[in-house]
Each structure stands twice: as C-alpha cells, then as structure tokens.
Amino acid sequence: MAQNVYGPGVRIGNWNEDVYLEEELMKDFLEKRDKGKLLIQRSRRLKQNLLRPMQLSVTEDGYIHYGDKVMLVNPDDPDTEADVFLRGDLSLCMTPDEIQSHLKDELEVPCGLSAVQAKTPIGRNTFIILSVHRDATGQVLRYGQDFCLGITGGFDNKMLYLSSDHRTLLKSSKRSWLQEVYLTDEVSHVNCWQAAFPDPQLRLEYEGFPVPANAKILINHCHTNRGLAAHRHLFLSTYFGKEAEVVAHTYLDSHRVEKPRNHWMLVTGNPRDASSSMLDLPKPPTEDTRAMEQAMGLDTQ
C-alpha cells in the first residue's frame, strides 16, 4: 500500500485524496475556530472567568450580612501537623474537572472544591452569603442561623451552591474518603450551613449573636452536622496545579475542641483598596513590640 510520507505537494500514491483530506481538516479547524469550540479557546474562556478579579463587600459594623461577597479562608496555624505541604492562609476555591471543562462551555455540575494559597478575590474563591427561606439581604447573619454559600465562578447568570451529603461507597472525597463537599446548581436541604462559635464552652451563649467578619468561626453542615475542614496534608492535582483537599468532617482534640482544620474566616473587602481583602492589611503591633519601640525611641505615636 502506497503511503505519502511527504507533504501534499509531493504527488506520490493517492495524492488527490491526501489533498482533499488536508482541505477538509482545514475547513473543520476554521469552523471550530469561528464557533469558539477549539480546546484552547474553551480553556482560555474558563480561565478568564475563574480568574476574573472580584470585589468583596466592605463591612461597616464589623459583622457579616446576607448578600455580602466574602472569601472563606482557613487561617494559618503554626501548631499544625508537620506533614502539611501548604502553609499560610488557604481560601476555598471551586475546582472544575480539567477534562470536562474542555468538553463543555459551562461549568460542570457537580463541581469540585479545594483550598488554595490565594488572598486576592477572584471568580473562583468569591462566595455570596444567601438566605435559605426568605429574602434577607442586608440583615445581619447570626450564629445558629441557616444560610447558603453561593458562587458564580465569574460567569454571568450562573449560581452554584456549596453542598454536602452523607458519605457512601460511591460518593466520598478523593483522598481521605470522608464526606465530600461539592458545588451544585440545585437548591435543597444539602445547601444549608450554620456558623458556630469556636469555643465550645461559650457556644450556647453566643447563639443568636451576630457573626463577626474576619474572625475565626466554625462552619457546620446542617443536614449531616459535619464541619467544613481543609486537609493541608492531602493534595489534589487540579486544573490549576496542586491544591489542598476540602471535606466535611469534624476534627476534635483531646479536650473535645475543634482543631484548626475546622477554623474558617469570612473575609471581607479592604476599605482602602477595592481590589484586595482584609488579609492584605498589616497587623497592628503587639504590646511587646510597642514597648520595645518606646525603649528604643522609635515610638511614632
């Protein structure tokens, strides 16, 4: 069987068929390019939406309100386990499947989640505090109240909800095999979450109090009573690289207190810079630092 190992311009064997084949391939390529169906075009659109800069809500009274745009951040803790591979503050991010994102123009449902070292608000890590039963936009979120966490991912007219459900043999997290956390477009009881005070001895006393912004809290799933947790020691190979796993599981120490894996902050926007968050503000000096500055004559107050 004759085979043309040269280009179509060299007429060897069934050269006429090779020429028509090259023309058909070029027509197919140009048609996909005009319709925006090339893999590189779909990948570019997806990254453009997920990495689109977002603006967080700025709190005036120091509390979280329904309708606020926030980032869910697992704060860094120096006393965590030694086997972690990601240090620093980790923000909760949506993580679409790499293969499915190339096959479709829209986000896949359900969509995965991960924790990333990202302090800048973008489309994949900016969540919206939503009410469950009625429109309560502008009202203060309180401890013990049900709420939903929605995310658009930088897309227009698209809303996915943070959800979780009981673990089964066919449905669990990829690395730890614990209860899975995912994003879905269906509104149901698996979308409901509650904020709890970190100290268990004061938890009941704080029931009904406003949830402070940029402070450590617990986020518990109402249906399964599991806490949102970040696994810094388990990584996932995602569309954007290696990122930490996120599950719904409550970790308790010997004193029956939730571990830092379950600690989260609802981070709001920086009033000085609309494109940044409160994590970018410098921390105030401690009393020891102030005393040292005064002793050295460096007190600027």
From Swiss-Prot:
Pfam families: CFAP161. Residues 269-301 are annotated as: Disordered. Its main location: cytoplasm. This is Cilia- and flagella-associated protein 161. Microtubule inner protein component of sperm flagellar doublet microtubules. The lineage of its organism: Eukaryota, Metazoa, Chordata, Craniata, Vertebrata. Expressed in airway epithelial cells. Keywords: Cell projection, Cilium, Cytoplasm, Cytoskeleton, Flagellum. Microtubule inner protein (MIP) part of the dynein-decorated doublet microtubules (DMTs) in cilia axoneme, which is required for motile cilia beating. GO terms for biological process: cilium assembly; flagellated sperm motility. It is found in: Cytoplasm, Cytoskeleton, Cilium axoneme; Cytoplasm, Cytoskeleton, Flagellum axoneme. GO terms for cellular component: axonemal A tubule inner sheath; axonemal microtubule; motile cilium; sperm flagellum. Coiled coil: none annotated.
